[in-house]
């Protein structure tokens, strides 16, 4: 999608049929709540599209948010609810479907292209690296991921745990330096108990004796 006309045509189409929605965040290291959408991929029954948002190949400075009534399939319900360019009341998590069928989380990294790996290594200390990786490479990655995830799609799986973990995550943790820190719950564990970590910190196992917990305080005082 590289013109306003093609964007408007796509937006009308999405109001009429179910589709897969996969998004690429600009920064590979930031939490979704501290991030932005670089581009997103749409797969309908017959067509594929990629829409640049903050990517340097974007055709507009103002890509609109869409709120639709049609079903949409996403790769991660929690991150989708944190930040997404398209919202719907009927959203299904493809990774959760894959896990329920195979008892294993889907490996999203296995289809990253050479361009992704090269830029991640070269610009490991830079922000928003995904904005400079060619859109065609993001599209190549998304195409393979969407095809594999669709194999295990089922509407019937209960997603309540994902909704609950999203509600916890979005509130964050207040710190002594007047900032918010966000964690990420992972329900895809061998024990079935969600882990809680992000950015190298295990929030579920903060040491009680070395002061690790003192930086987190109540925001309700």
Residue locations for each model-derived region?
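Generic low-polarity alpha-helical segments
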Residues: 22, 42-43, 112, 135, ...
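Alpha-helix initiation/capping motif
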Residues: 52, 59-62, 67, 76, ...
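Conserved RNase H-like, two-metal-ion catalytic cores of nucleic-acid enzymes
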Residues: 1-115
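Mixed-charge, glycine-rich, non-catalytic linkers/tails in nucleic-acid processing enzymes
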Residues: 89, 96-99, 105, 111, ...
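A glycine-rich phosphate-binding loop feature that marks nucleotide/adenosyl-phosphate handling sites
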Residues: 83, 156-161, 178, 182, ...
């Amino acid at each position: 999608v590289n013109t306003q006309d093609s964007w408007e045509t796509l937006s009308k189409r999405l109001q009429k049929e179910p589709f897969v929605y996969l998004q690429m965040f600009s920064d590979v290291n930031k939490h979704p709540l501290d991030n932005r959408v670089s581009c997103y991929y749409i797969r309908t029954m017959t067509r594929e599209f990629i829409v640049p948002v903050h990517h340097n190949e974007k055709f507009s400075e103002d890509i609109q948010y869409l709120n639709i009534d049609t079903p949409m399939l996403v790769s991660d319900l929690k991150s989708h609810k944190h930040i997404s360019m398209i919202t719907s009341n009927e959203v299904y998590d493809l990774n959760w479907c894959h896990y329920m069928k195979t008892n294993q989380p889907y490996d999203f990294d296995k289809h990253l292209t050479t361009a992704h790996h090269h830029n991640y290594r070269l610009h490991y200390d830079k922000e928003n690296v995904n904005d400079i990786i060619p859109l065609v490479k993001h599209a190549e990655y998304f195409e393979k991921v969407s095809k594999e995830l669709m194999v295990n799609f089922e509407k019937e799986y209960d997603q309540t745990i994902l909704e609950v973990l999203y509600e916890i995550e979005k509130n964050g943790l207040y710190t002594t330096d007047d900032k918010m820190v966000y964690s990420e719950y992972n329900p895809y564990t061998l024990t079935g108990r969600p882990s809680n970590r992000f950015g190298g910190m295990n929030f579920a196992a903060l040491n009680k004796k070395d002061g690790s917990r003192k930086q987190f305080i109540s925001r309700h005082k």
